[in-house]
Each structure stands twice: as C-alpha cells, then as structure tokens.
Amino acid sequence: MSRVGKLPITIPEGVKVGLNDLEVKISGPKGELSKTFKGNIAISLEENKLLVKPLAANKNARAMWGTARSIISNMVTGVKEGFKLKLEINGVGYRAMVKGKYLNLMLAKSHNTKIEIPSDIKIEVPKQNIIILEGTDKEKLGQFASIIIKQRPPEPYKGKGIKFENQFIPRKEGKKN
C-alpha cells in the first residue's frame, strides 16, 4: 500500500478543483493548471479533500497512485503559493541578464547563450550571478532550471558553473607533481 498515495489532499480556501474523469483542473490566486492522468487510478473529491485510489492491484497502478497524488499536491501548492528556485553562477566573467523574453547568459564561451523564457515562468536577476525563477508548475520550473544549468554545469575542480542555491559541489584535488 502506498504511504504517499493514501494521504488525502486538502484543498485550501481560494483554490477551485474541477474533475473530468482523469483530467484534473486546479485554479487559484496564482493561476490555473490542468493535467490528464493515465488509467489505473481513480480521483475523487470528497468534503474539500481530493482522494487518489488505484483501480488495480498491479505494480504499475500502485506506482501511479503515489505519483499522481504528489503531482496533484504540487499543483494545489503551485496555484495557491507558487514555487521559487534560486540559481547561482560561479566563475570569473560569468553573468546573466534578462532581455525581453530571453535569458542572456555569458559563460566564457565564444558566444552568448540565449534561452527563451517560457510564458508561465517569471525570471528575476537581482545580481549578475543570481537567477530567481518563479512559477506555478513545479515540473516546468525544474525542467527550465535544468536547461539553464546544462549550459555550464558546475565542475569539481574550481567550482565554476551554474548550480542551485544550496547545492553542494564535491571538490576534487588537482594534479600533483
């Protein structure tokens, strides 16, 4: 039995939930999210609580049970409070700036890297080496952050690169003569 899946999702005030078979639409003060789930689970709304239940006893249904519950819980949190990720850029001459709908990264390459900002994600660059991402969809926010990090992942010798704010980068010792 899934320990995550069996917990009910409490719907806070100001958040509206719409169910249409396996499609869940959640709207709140920060925006609206919708997601369609595959079979093997049943989603029901009872007394301001969402319940997710498996329809079969096989391994796939049990796996989707906990996953669907976590995704719906993140959707509720996203439309109510939103999510925020902070990225740090370490390295001499490494910078970030927002120009229109593009994030412009200068990462010691022969060219500047331009990344188009998705419409549902807000980017703030308070300093040249800090990027703050905000959005309602946790999955899209993490995906966009990984696209940014992929441009210059942190390296273990000098620690240069883009990383999450509190991410620990294990350091290696250089060559010995």
Swiss-Prot record:
<dbReference type="GO" id="GO:0003735">
    <property type="term" value="F:structural constituent of ribosome"/>
</dbReference>
<dbReference type="InterPro" id="IPR020040">
    <property type="entry name" value="Ribosomal_uL6_a/b-dom"/>
</dbReference>
<keyword id="KW-0689">Ribosomal protein</keyword>
<dbReference type="InterPro" id="IPR000702">
    <property type="entry name" value="Ribosomal_uL6-like"/>
</dbReference>
<dbReference type="GO" id="GO:0019843">
    <property type="term" value="F:rRNA binding"/>
</dbReference>
<dbReference type="GO" id="GO:0005840">
    <property type="term" value="C:ribosome"/>
</dbReference>
<dbReference type="InterPro" id="IPR019906">
    <property type="entry name" value="Ribosomal_uL6_bac-type"/>
</dbReference>
<comment type="function">
    <text>This protein binds to the 23S rRNA, and is important in its secondary structure. It is located near the subunit interface in the base of the L7/L12 stalk, and near the tRNA binding site of the peptidyltransferase center.</text>
</comment>
<dbReference type="InterPro" id="IPR036789">
    <property type="entry name" value="Ribosomal_uL6-like_a/b-dom_sf"/>
</dbReference>
<dbReference type="GO" id="GO:1990904">
    <property type="term" value="C:ribonucleoprotein complex"/>
</dbReference>
<keyword id="KW-0699">rRNA-binding</keyword>
<keyword id="KW-0694">RNA-binding</keyword>
<dbReference type="GO" id="GO:0002181">
    <property type="term" value="P:cytoplasmic translation"/>
</dbReference>
<dbReference type="Pfam" id="PF00347">
    <property type="entry name" value="Ribosomal_L6"/>
</dbReference>
<keyword id="KW-0687">Ribonucleoprotein</keyword>
<dbReference type="InterPro" id="IPR002358">
    <property type="entry name" value="Ribosomal_uL6_CS"/>
</dbReference>
<protein>
    <recommendedName>
        <fullName>Large ribosomal subunit protein uL6</fullName>
    </recommendedName>
</protein>
<comment type="similarity">
    <text>Belongs to the universal ribosomal protein uL6 family.</text>
</comment>
<comment type="subunit">
    <text>Part of the 50S ribosomal subunit.</text>
</comment>
